[in-house]
């Protein structure tokens, strides 16, 4: 994936929409069904994550595009693109996620479980998020956005 040309509001809007929706749904699932958080804790975490995700969505998109470019220098295989997507997702999201959980009062054990579970699930989730983000960028008609690989 690459975004060619200057910053566009469509790009930021697509990245923000994708991150808020995807992280709300997947985060709640992990927190309740894997980490053992209560519905109320998870809902508080997800509500706090919305403004955080709005703030980090576009920078994450830029970071992801950078990681994809680095991966494409190694190989143009879709496997390498998926590895780059996964790496970008885990490296960028894990510290942010831990901070959100700490802020809403999750225990240290819950934070460790949630962040490590999220990293493990990201082996699939990060790649799906990449596809979801690509679809959102296309739906938002991001100028100059092209699909490579």
Curated annotation (Swiss-Prot):
Coiled coil: none annotated. The chain crosses the membrane at residues 17-37, 43-63, 86-106, 111-131. Keywords: Amino-acid transport, Cell inner membrane, Cell membrane, Membrane, Transmembrane, Transmembrane helix, Transport. GO terms for molecular function: L-amino acid efflux transmembrane transporter activity. One of its GO terms (biological process) is amino acid export across plasma membrane. It is found in: Cell inner membrane. GO terms for cellular component: plasma membrane. It is a multi-pass membrane protein. InterPro entries: Ala_export_AlaE (IPR010574). Signal peptide: none annotated. It holds the Pfam family AlaE. Exports L-alanine. Belongs to the AlaE exporter family. This is L-alanine exporter AlaE. The lineage of its organism: Bacteria, Pseudomonadati, Pseudomonadota, Gammaproteobacteria, Vibrionales.
